[in-house]
């Protein structure tokens, strides 16, 4: 067999062994995808003993391409929620997550400066301690740019030494916080449910009776609130007649209007229109019905709702828009993106015509447009290769193959659509590409690190590196967890999700979810901090490398 054939065969073997190891669980917690790294270490140990030669160029390409695939698909996944997670509702959680990253970075500086640990090893320990594989790839990239040789081997070994406690340390921090504050999980779950039920969704329906005599005879668009597009009137009831109103529909005293909007906007409309009445808000009687419609028609992508003329042509109202799990009040200037879910209300005989304009082809949600994928990857590599200079830094910085595709993917996923190209990717396809990418990357890192892993563990500084990893993992988590509980007054289950999200660690999230299985607090806080944390985890080793290398 050729060297390339042997290399590919061993990569497949590493993936099989590693994924098998990753499925081993102790009390419900396992290595997960990190098992591939240890599968590579085991295989490399025996290949070195038997003198098998691997093709270095193939390994290098597979490692870099796997990293690119992983970070690009991560960016596409979290992109729509990345910028919204920075809004006011998630500021406190994201601030605590950033504090964990900052404290972890300070710990790396202390390990490097005080303990005199070489920079490449310190960054490898950091990546393993925070269980973030893209951070390892980013660190290797920047050190290679700085001219530090043989970083793959040393960083891979130190990463592997710190990784196991990186997972266990999060679980230990959760347990100690629970013990220290004498937390009663059932009480925490009840408190979270009570708080979340008050604001379970961003938009609400109410029915208002027109009692303001000044509105009699005015058209809908002339009433304050509708002209500002703060709320949507999805239907109007007058005596026994029920219609979907247009902007030009005249309003009469005693009409009942069903409105959709956020709490503040609806409160204003109560003052303007009249008092709230009990009226059906879900069932649509007569010929009026509502449908949830998915935007799949390429002809409407990037167009504004006003330009489609759906309301004018068919008398259909778009009362809600759900984008990446976030509910919005649609306005005439709202631009449609692939995968948007619209709540449409109209007469049965014309609603289907309006739906055909939007698309609602469910099978398209299962298809992947490959052209945007490779455009995004290509742009990401180009952006990652652009040097930018910061005063005081000795070398030009680059986002690299880890940061470039991530930043581009975040932006493209946020934009959503350019012409007929859309960057929506079905979750199953995204997960498949992401898993393939990280398996390839970890398999190569394991193969390159395995030759010296056991020797370092037994005869070298392996145990010392483990100790530094415990320090980097545990100290930031326990400090921020205590502050979040003591001063931030955060729910314990929310703190568990925050700690897991700050390490981008799915096994830790699984553990947090099992603390109270019927409660979504941990998953919600994990999802809130995950996008920003993933970005910062990839960028932080690069900044640390440049700062410490220059010092």
Swiss-Prot record:
GO cellular component: plasma membrane
Record keyword Endoplasmic reticulum present: no
Record field: transmembrane: 4-24, 28-48, 65-85, 95-115, 157-177, 370-390, 402-424, 438-458, 463-483, 492-512, 529-549
Xref: PROSITE patterns: RCK_C
Keywords: Cell membrane, Membrane, Repeat, Transmembrane, Transmembrane helix, Transport
GO terms, molecular function: monoatomic cation transmembrane transporter activity
Residue stretches making up the RCK C-terminal domain: 191-275, 277-360
Protein's GO biological process: potassium ion transport
Protein name: Putative transport protein CGSHiGG_02670
One Pfam family from the record: TrkA_C
Membrane topology value: Multi-pass membrane protein
Protein family (similarity comment): Belongs to the AAE transporter (TC 2.A.81) family. YidE subfamily.
